[in-house]
């Protein structure tokens, strides 16, 4: 046995200072937390030594490393310590589904000696530890990156193939991020492709655009199964071409870093994508791009710079909201204007392909501005729960009003019928991109209330009727948006064959399906028959639709197959173990951690809480005699704890 020590970075800043990115003064309660009257929480200091068994067979070491890299990690910074019970169940827009996180929890519980099927059996072999959900008849599949095994070389890619990838980009990401006109990209490819004398900036930019185009495919059996490795190859080539791009301050550097962010998001590298998007914004602010300075006397270049800033700003605002991280755009930076002359392009060629639509971009900018507003309102620790509910409902109405008052009526249509087959393909693509943005934004607005209501029901926490009604409205709205977004993506792609960044679009479907999963698991006893039938129909239809997606993507969405859903539902709601003579479900077991860490359940500070102590994680029960005046602050603390779980 050889011990391999790997140091782990220790942050001595408290959570609030870390989020604000300010120096923490330390102490029992740091200066910043005193200033804002907030709870000062430090990470547990620790060092971890990883032990690895190996013999002289180097291939086994490589296989073990690859397998470890394929295990999904949580976004939450509080999950660095395996001994921590602060499990994040549901990250904001993480590609990690509820199924993946439950699997991680089960493996961890087994590692700690809590085998749900065999009480008292603490000797868990490494093979059993990795099984997780396989014990219950579910085989968890993860997305594998085959880029390392892919023979990537520019010499193997013809000019015809390159042009096809360029067109794939124009048919997909050019719509939400229209920085270049189509003719500009074709000119870039002509002067750069396999040209040794071309500038490194042009080469890197072209490689990134080709990477984005490479990840596009169709939701059918004829789609190309090697798209993801090719996209990864171009992305890595771009990084090698401009290794010091982050030290530059120029328009070229901003374009390259921005497309790095989009490409990384396209490949599922959420953390990298978020990092690059913030870097692109900071670069833009540093050179004054947000002030629309005249970097060139050419009018075409001026409009392109405007499109660059608007695209960078709206993408960073949207993406930071999705991954549940703060936006790096300062509050004093105004919302970018969307001038009609900069965002109106009739298209390329006689058929007007790859046009730029002003109204589409105007809506995207408005939605991105709502993202920061939602983030600040929902996750504000200075607002009580009832006012948060009212404010969020008002923001939702503002989003609806702006969207449905659009001058382009095609962008706001919801019905899908035979007319879609004769619809102009440019209009169809724009409609698809803006409507999934709208539906996803609505889903994200209400998802915290869906989860919080489940926590409240599990803990049997008392709450005023108006708060419970508000939570129910938000929960029901979230479920409806999840149903709508799944139906829209599936039905439109069946009517109109469109190139899609499949892995990216699958994250929309996965987010919607995990919401439905969560709702089924937490409401199985009282869900109405008609709604249950509709949810199961949507889930089955989504699974059937995804079976036609290209090879590398199937693994990432197989966990929502019908048999897996039924198995998961049985696991969560079946009586499987006894805890202090009280029957609990797996769902109870998973969810009870939030009660342990909630400030509302501190028995040392309030005698009204009855504690039932045992070796297993402690469960707390509220005294029924507590009056509403005492319960409201407790519920508020419970709400803030839930937000911390969801968003950190």
From Swiss-Prot:
GO cellular component annotations of the record: nucleus
DNA-binding region residue numbers: 13-42
Keywords for the protein's UniProt record, in alphabetical order: DNA-binding, Metal-binding, Nucleus, Transcription, Transcription regulation, Zinc
DNA-binding keyword on record: yes
Summary of subunit composition and partner proteins: Monomer.
Function noted in UniProt: May be involved in the facilitation of anaphase progression in mitosis.
The protein, known as: Zinc finger protein grt1
Gene that encodes the chain: grt1
